[in-house]
């Protein structure tokens, strides 16, 4: 099985909240797709609650598009990580990390402005696979954590696992 890019960085040294370019690739037509690691929590030390991350998934996707799309950037998808420490965001374009960080903070401010759980988009059995598993309060606690702590940039060259360590881990 091929080694995925996300497993070549040292999770014990990742800062959070932080933006990291996880991968860039070119499509056959020459467009650049960039995948960002939006790390909300420090790996293996913190985790987002399942109801909060689920609600955030519904809110974050729209709010990030409001603040980031345009000027050569179009978000394809924003999905929570299975480890519940962040989200992956795939987009067309190559925005600077600071632009992404600023959009992320603006999106978190928007989450704090949502006044009622009934205002969560697609919160029904027809559009959500687990529509009863939501918490606006938890999503807002996550958003407040981001705004209180700020967003830094994680750099792959600073987090790269040495080849010796990858061999030691049998990868």
Curated annotation (Swiss-Prot):
GO terms for biological process: quorum sensing. Fe cation binds at residues 54, 58, 128. It catalyses: S-(5-deoxy-D-ribos-5-yl)-L-homocysteine = (S)-4,5-dihydroxypentane-2,3-dione + L-homocysteine. Keywords: Autoinducer synthesis, Iron, Lyase, Metal-binding, Quorum sensing. One of its GO terms (molecular function) is S-ribosylhomocysteine lyase activity. Its EC number is 4.4.1.21. InterPro entries: LuxS_sf, Metalloenz_LuxS/M16, S-ribosylhomocysteinase. It holds the Pfam family LuxS. Its cofactor is Fe cation. Binds 1 Fe cation per subunit. Gene3D superfamilies: S-ribosylhomocysteinase (LuxS). Involved in the synthesis of autoinducer 2 (AI-2) which is secreted by bacteria and is used to communicate both the cell density and the metabolic potential of the environment. The regulation of gene expression in response to changes in cell density is called quorum sensing. Catalyzes the transformation of S-ribosylhomocysteine (RHC) to homocysteine (HC) and 4,5-dihydroxy-2,3-pentadione (DPD). NCBIfam families: PRK02260.1-2. Belongs to the LuxS family. PANTHER family: S-RIBOSYLHOMOCYSTEINE LYASE. Homodimer. This is S-ribosylhomocysteine lyase. It comes from Serratia marcescens. The lineage of its organism: Bacteria, Pseudomonadati, Pseudomonadota, Gammaproteobacteria, Enterobacterales. The gene is luxS.
